[in-house]
Amino acid sequence: MNRLRYLTAGESHGPSLTAIIEGMPANLELNEGDINRDLARRQLGYGRGGRMLIEKDKVNFTSGVRWGKTLGSPITLSIQNRDWENWGKKMSPVAEDFVEGMAITHPRPGHADLTGVIKYRQDDARNILERSSARETAARVAVGALCKKFLADLGMSVLGYVSELGGVCADASLEDYHERFALSEESPCRTFDAEAEQRMIKAIDRAKEDGDSLGGVVEVAVLGAPVGLGSYVQWDRRLDGRLAYAMMSIQAFKGVEIGLGFEAGRRPGSQVHDEIFHQGDEFVRKTNRAGGLEGGMTNGAPIIVRGAMKPIPTLYQPLQTVDFRTKDAFAAVVERSDVCAVPAAAVVAEAVVAIEMAQAMLEKFGGDAMEEVKQNLQAYGEYVQRF
């Protein structure tokens, strides 16, 4: 069983972000544009902050790719932080560069600041917030873009967009996921409903005027996944659990749904389960309330995953906190931030879902080279057609 794994490293205002991916087969055609396209998408969206005017993320391959193809060895991706020019002393690894009086001691509610300084025995929340920052997601988007390229070569698509923002819901009557995605790519709020988009923009503008922030819900659709990815035989091999884990690992995500999600708990069984029919030479379901996953496995229908993102906790009208040294009351520190990052979160959600789907495909059809993976997938597809 082939296994795909990765690590990311780097601080928000450090020199760079780095990701190392192991397990990607050889001979996948790949270029920097495949990665940079999604890095640019992550930086777009109505409500983003000033950092996006500084960073223009570009990836650099430093291992694992030669002449436009993967080698089968670990792939290293590096993304330079342009803002490092302004932070060289503040984030220096050299002890002699220490500057007195720069410690952040007013932890921000809703962030990792206070718990982090307690856990890691720090006296400066800067040492926590630099790594806990959502800037880290740029590295995961790069890994996800690589996985999306792998999946595309196997006939699969991973499409992310915004279904709700600041309490404004997009009209879900549009059922064509490719059309939803195409429309959302033209939207500053990354949504497919033009009327809802205008109300979302107004909500973001109001929040900015009030020094507040907004959250929302993103949806990811996976199209073209074969039957039988994942497994029911152990809890940690259930693909729905792994997708939920991946989505919940995104900074500021507080809830995940697959298919009907929580609505399934409000309906009788007759309105939840997808009836099975046989048409032509295949089994079909006329509904997809399960969201493409039954028993922890893909059933051949589109996989539909949604994630709820809370409002960004850095507010320009700061919430109450205390100085963790003196215990005196203060307003929370204001770090440069977004009013709303939900449109960007849809791209991050795409990435983490793509990583899990690539892992599941390699577990089922893995090989050392893309040619072998495709042969295994084709043989399995022929078996499914005969069943």
From Swiss-Prot:
Its EC number is 4.2.3.5. Keywords: Amino-acid biosynthesis, Aromatic amino acid biosynthesis, FAD, Flavoprotein, FMN, Lyase, NADP. GO terms for biological process: amino acid biosynthetic process; aromatic amino acid family biosynthetic process; chorismate biosynthetic process. Pathway: Metabolic intermediate biosynthesis; chorismate biosynthesis; chorismate from D-erythrose 4-phosphate and phosphoenolpyruvate: step 7/7. Pfam families: Chorismate_synt. It comes from the Bacteria. It catalyses: 5-O-(1-carboxyvinyl)-3-phosphoshikimate = chorismate + phosphate. FMN binds at R131, S132, S133, Q251, A252, G295, K310, P311, I312, P313, T314, R336. This reaction introduces a second double bond into the aromatic ring system. HAMAP family: Chorismate_synth (MF_00300). Homotetramer. This is Chorismate synthase. It comes from Syntrophotalea carbinolica (strain DSM 2380 / NBRC 103641 / GraBd1). The gene is aroC.
